[in-house]
Amino acid sequence: MTYDFDLIVIGAGSGGVRASRISAGHGARVAVIEESRPGGTCVIRGCVPKKLLMYGSAFSAEAADAAGFGWQVAVDGHDWPELIDAKNRELDRLEGIYRSLLTNAGVELIEGRGLIAGPHEVAVGERHLTAERILVATGGWPQIPEVPGLAEHGITSNEALDLAARPDRVLVYGAGYIAVEFASIFNGFGAETHLVYRADLPLRGFDDDIREESAVALAGRGIILHPGCTLTGVTAQADGLKAVGLSDGTEIVVDQVMAATGRLPNTAGLGLKTVGITLGPKGEIPVDANSRSEVDSIFAVGDVTDRVALTPVAIAEGHAFADSVFGGRPRQVTHANIPSAVFTQPPIASVGLTEDGARSQYGEVAVFISRFNAMKNTISGRSEKTLMKLIVDTASDRVVGAHMLGPDAGEIMQGIGVAIIAGATKADFDATIGIHPTAAEEFVTMRTPRS
């Protein structure tokens, strides 16, 4: 059978664009369909704009810290619209780069919503296209929990990036990385910030020592924590404020209430069920190690598969798909030991197993932990601690987990990730000369395991 394309990709986010470009580079005829803006979640409404706001929010603390070093820095106010305009200009620039990457690779960009009409057919409005293979890369979308009034009066991360005005009082509902990052952002811009979550500690899935220290750090920055609570309802007041009820009986009045309790695969209305794909419990597309669905001609990468919802993972999966299917170089992406970071203030980073996970997998482990004042804080007067932790499989001496809370955690952890992927032992860490004075040198100078 003759097809219009060798590959149709639905979704021009990070994973879809990488798969499109590499496939075209291998000689495939490729079209990518996008209903919004090329760049997807990360570039348009996720990692990039969020980190730009995080950078902006950090200056208030920097100004406060400067006093200990002899600087008298007055923070008289902040021009929120100017920041949003600057952020939008950068997103426009990045979107243009994504469009150019597709054009230069020979990929046809089709704007509209793609609907899978058959194992080899995608409809975009009145246009019907055929391809030997279809790749779904539509990402994820914020979920809003079923709380009376929350959907009507609340916002998600999508809207939080484009608020017309900086809120003076905000409540963030959730305790995952998105929730704590936005709580840090709003707090840094001077908003009275409440963080409400069901568990005892934020950041479920991270190492417990990091979770405990993060709660201390968030509270130390002035964020008001409400652990063990859920929302019971949100009502709008005549003055435009929102009254938010908590399960402990508290009522909090805020300018904005943000739902950040998780994201779900963006599969609704794609026509997947009609072609024989049974979605998972979260709406995800189940795929094998080669990103192939139960329909042989349909593949999926990125957040839509609910494997590891991180942009670099989607990019790696898209690249591996293209090399395997069109490049004659079959390979798979391993989802173990993926470094990650949480861009709170202070930031958090992790790679490998948590202490509990390591004990479950290896049995006997040695844990090395250091909690100290960063050098800058000794003069700034900030009481915030830096926490570093290594987890070692006792039998092999391999370092199987590394965790950090403190300045530059993400930058430091990227290098530690290479060591763990390479199978470095604790002896290798011990034999490495540290760079002094840095916080990072602590990872190669911890000698005594925790009893």
Located regions from the model:
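Glycine-rich Rossmann-fold phosphate-binding loop(s) that bind the pyrophosphate
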Residues: G11-S14, E35-S36, Y173-G176, F206, ...
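A Rossmann-like FAD-binding core segment of flavoenzymes
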Residues: A74, E108-E111, L115-A123, F189-A289, ...
